[in-house]
Amino acid sequence: MSALFSPIKLRGLELPNRIMVAPMCQYSSVNGEANDWHFTHINTLALSGAAMFCIEATHVEAIGRITPGCLGLYDDATEAALKPILVSVRKHSKTAVAIQLAHAGRKASSHKPWDGGQQIPVSQGGWQAEGPSAVPHKEGEAPPLALDAPGLARVRDAFVNAARRAERLGIDAIELHSAHGYLLHQFLSPISNKRTDQYGGSLQNRMRYPLEVFDAVRAAFPAEKPVGIKVSATDWVEGGWDLAQTIEYAKELKKRGVDWIDASSGGVSPLQKIPLGPGYQVPFAQAIKEATGVTTMAVGLITEAKQAEDIVVSGKADMVALARAMLYDPRWGWHAAAELGGQVEAPPQYWRSQPSTQKALFGTTTFGTR
């Protein structure tokens, strides 16, 4: 039996395989609202064969968006825009739906990547970003405003309100974004956090605010539903956040009931030097799992079925999260199951597509004729 296509349970959520479609920013919203692009994108990948699809980084405040095109869940309009998409997914797919809740912090007010990705000045239609400290992401950029006590409370409450909206929408799980140089990661990293109060300096202090946000979201979301987190295991910059600190963070998250840790890396500094290669971040998931016993997801240049199978079989991670590989092959899960001898759920409209040599790929399928 394929390990990749064996079941796993995250709190009260039972998944038939170990594959998640990773959250991928689409930069295609207007005023934070999902639209026809998201309808097509989400419904397509909900039929990928993955056990869980995670909606892209969904921002808890308008000023917390990376770009003007980023998705939000911070008011009635953004909540209402997601609802018909989720109704459609539920109608046609059994895939669990998670949502990644995020705040860009000092990396907010940026152009879309295909428009250059640089900071948008306030004078050109951008907005004032906020962060742990008044330290810009890049030299020459306008610095963020350092969040004061009321600001910290406001952002924490925005995460809570987004979690409650996610529950109203029937979302199955939440992933908190504390990676890739966004707000929660900015608090963790000594590169971006220069505070001298209880939220800066020592490792315990730098972890304090992200852990407070996790606690608040966990308390706001139903107890039977899982809450995971995405981390950057290293900044890839000397003197920055690293794997040893990540493991301490993971231990604190375990005490608080985290249901999975999605182990990525980088994003907090343009000085990063990342040694890209197939599965280059898998050792981070493995180290976190071995040190804490927390369920981990491996992510990053996982593209082949055998590669994903080996990651799970070897115990390096409990699950795999795929992003660009899913965009390139939106039926990646089907093809992986066919290669590994697994089984996936598919809508009856597509049953006839299974290979003639693999009539069990979609389970029991029968057709009447006359």
Predicted segments, located by residue:
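Flavin-dependent oxidoreductase catalytic cores
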Residues: 1-370
